[in-house]
Amino acid sequence: MADTCFRLHTEFEPTGDQPEAIGQIVANLGHGVRDQVLLGVTGSGKTFTVANVIAACNRPALILAPNKTLAAQLYNEFRALFPDNAVEYFVSYYDYYQPEAYVPASDTYIEKDSSINDNIDKLRHAATHALLTRRDVVIVASVSCIYGLGSPEYYARLVIPVECGQRFSMDALMTRLVEVQYQRNDFDFHRGTFRVRGDVLEVIPAYHHERALRIEFFGDDIDAISEIDPLTGEVLGSVGKTVIYPASHYVSDRDNLVRAMSDIRDELGERLREYQSANRLVEAQRLEQRTMLDLEMMEELGYCNGIENYSRHLDGRAAGQPPSCLLDYFPDDFLLFVDESHITVPQVGAMYKGDRSRKSTLVDFGFRLPSALDNRPLEFAEFLTRINQTVYVSATPGKWELDRSQGVIAEQIIRPTGLVDPVVEVRPTRGQVDDLLAECRARAARDERVLITTLTKRMAEDLTEHLGNMGLSVRYLHSDIDTMERMAIIQALRRGECDVLVGINLLREGLDIPEVSLVSILDADKEGFLRSTGSLIQTFGRAARNAAGRVILYADTVTASMRAAMDETARRRERQQAWNEANGIEPRTIRKSLDTPFDAIYSAASEGGKGKGRGRGRQAAPAVENVAEYGTSPEDMAKHIQKLEREMREAAKELEFERAATLRDRIRLLRERLIEA
């Protein structure tokens, strides 16, 4: 394993509160402190602080983010800071995912259906490959990192080392490649496949798509190894020796597969006896038919669809024992940084229960063996046993993180840019819509943007319609919009294609929009989750990247949460102003590229690796969509996708499954066009 040092590339030096925060965190890590909090306001450079800590400690790091959008943003930032090191991205590789489920009330079985993004799958393989081959690794991940992944022991054991001069026949190498789930394809050469031309074998590893390996044979000996461009065949360089890693994380050697299949048959027999003794013959027949079909496929091909449901047997785990996951690929001394910890920590704790509820129904009614329950995310307690030293990063850390860290907090209030927290003003609710309309028009005249947050979906819809009728360009961000469409709407706001964005609970963490100079919160005095102190502070922060930032709270009373949020914001504002005066700094609005966080990640998708379907999705040919009919801008396409999704759900509700499937395929095609746009 390569032991390369982290090299931080930046023209900036830590400033403001950053040097003290970096020094404090590094010292605590050196003294063995397991849990600590980095309390940093929006725009204070928390990512830069974390990067400096990683470079100073020189240990592998996992950055855990609450969603794909933030993970993509962090991935791009860390790649820029550590260009010479391995910065990888690990999130769910599904563009579309319908989990397997059964609804007893209507006797409806829903088959698993999904579309896998090939580029993200490549990035996941690159992440595990990096962890097994070097130590200078930063992995940016979502909660996908706690879901079951193949055993790192089997994954590492089944690598294929090749070396010039090695006695290794082509037939033997092809056999080994097939065993680790590479496919021979002499015509469509892509990631995870190999081809043969005379005495030359070429393979594209699972963790690459821009480079292939060319292995030349002389008889039964390897004569030469080189890296080539898979498209042009141009030789990029010679290689003395290399290692080919498996094409799937769920790989197993033949002996282990035979043992696992025997265990599956034993479990099947035991389960069938239970059903028969309870006179549940339908469930018994269903389970036997489905399991025997899977076993037959495993016998012939070495894998089956949904093989992850048998992962307990493949790994040799006992019933109830947690699965291997990305955390098991890290060395024991890795560092964990939990970004937006007040959201991410509860999210980690919630994953297990939701997964368990769905799978229990499948097991009870004979669609899966009980061992399928052990293909699951980690329970929260299991997650805690797998992590080492942790830094919880948030502007508003939750009670759990504060208790866990026992008061070990590094505070980062000063923004190096000099930007101060926005001025917060409370206005009465009487005439609030007309007052807000005037404020929005004033911002639009100055080419600035406005975020408005409401408490209910109905209010958001009505307000959006009213502002639109009054001549403003306004968009509504709601929970039915997926990640890519959401980013398209946000980019439209940043480009000035709309002036106002209205939402409910979607305008808090991670929305980095420097063009926003006004955040307006309606019904601010309605106490609750969306108007708690932490939620209000996070929402205020959306206006903290603009020098003219201001927050207007429409309320008839000042609640305890409002008062606490305003007092904390005022404290931070005063501290920043004092620092600015002492250092002669004039606050200036942040200038940020209009590229989305996903541009780098999805770039390969628009070059041909669009994503591969699984389940029924693979067979259905997408209908040709006349995109021009709906406009070619990302916003028009996003709106049409929303319309098609509503039609798809309605069709499924009316049991018009063929129409629903056609609509689904049109949605997939439009999403691919949206990525390209």
UniProtKB/Swiss-Prot annotation:
Residues 638-673 form the UVR domain. The keyword Lipid metabolism does not apply. GO terms for molecular function: ATP binding; ATP hydrolysis activity; DNA binding; excinuclease ABC activity. Keywords: ATP-binding, Cytoplasm, DNA damage, DNA excision, DNA repair, Excision nuclease, Nucleotide-binding, SOS response. Residues 27-414 form the Helicase ATP-binding domain. SMART domains: DEXDc, HELICc. The beta-hairpin motif is involved in DNA binding. This is UvrABC system protein B. The lineage of its organism: Bacteria, Pseudomonadati, Thermodesulfobacteriota, Desulfovibrionia, Desulfovibrionales.
